[in-house]
Amino acid sequence: MIGITANADEFVYKSFTTADIATMLGALCAFLLFNSRFFHLKQAAVFLGDAGSTAIGFCIVYLLIDFSQGSSALISPVTAGWILGLPLLDGSAVIGKRLLSGVSPIKPGRDHIHHILLDAGFSVNQTVGTLVLIHSLLVFIGVSAKLVAGFYADMFLFWLFVSLVFLRIIMTNLISRYSIASAKR
């Protein structure tokens, strides 16, 4: 009887988590609808802000940690990192670059990838489209490699992600040097 109760408790917990995910996805879809510029809107109608971004990030990370831990883990921790994809890659690269430069990692700056694209002349829609494409590619690589290679993919995927962070730092340095050299001409 205790085993049935424990299984029912876990089922209710997972169902509650599923309801939470569905609610969060619905809210995010509504936000994206009001924030898109596809309906001839010149600017976003809703501003998410720091608190909203932090809350969404916390919920996503909480769910990924929950799904990647324990005996009934649905995904591996490395796959969770690839699902986070672009925000994790960009944040790691920016923090790494700032630390290597001797700058505080929490100092504001225009070295995030969306700033780089906007400064390079991309429109807001082009920037969003590019970021969605890059993130989708990262998620596809992480999830498909895990499905194909199974357990042995974790170490490869981890080092591939670390390599991408360093590649992002190098590319950002090259772009900024090229931009500075072009501006001096």
Model-found features: residue ranges?
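Alpha-helical transmembrane segments
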Residues: M1-K184
